[in-house]
C-alpha cells in the first residue's frame, strides 16, 4: 500500500458582511500534540454572527475539540465516538457560557472536524459548515 500524503492549507476571511472574523481553525501538529498516535486533527468553527459572541463560541469549540480528542490514546474504531464526545462537550460548554452571561450574550458556532489516522479518515460535522475530500488528481 502506498503511503498517505496529506497536504493541508487553512485560511479564514470575515467576508463582505461582517467586520469581525468569527472563525477559528485548528491544524494539529503531530510532532507537538500530546498524543501523536491519535493522528492528525483538523477543524473549523464558524461563529454565528446573529449572536453577540460568535468568536468566543468558535474558539471554545476548537479548544474543547482538541482537549477531548487528545485526552488519551484512541484506537482506530474509537475515533468516531471520541469526536462525538468532543462535539457534545463543546456544545455543553458553549451553551453554559452563553446561558451564564444572560440571553443577550447567547453564542453559537458551527463545527466541522476531520481526524486522519494512518489511511483512515473520519469526518464530523455540526451546522452548515462543509468539508470536501478532493483527490490529488482533481485539485487545481
Where are these regions (language model features)?
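PP2C/PPM-type serine/threonine phosphatase catalytic domain
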Residues: 1-140
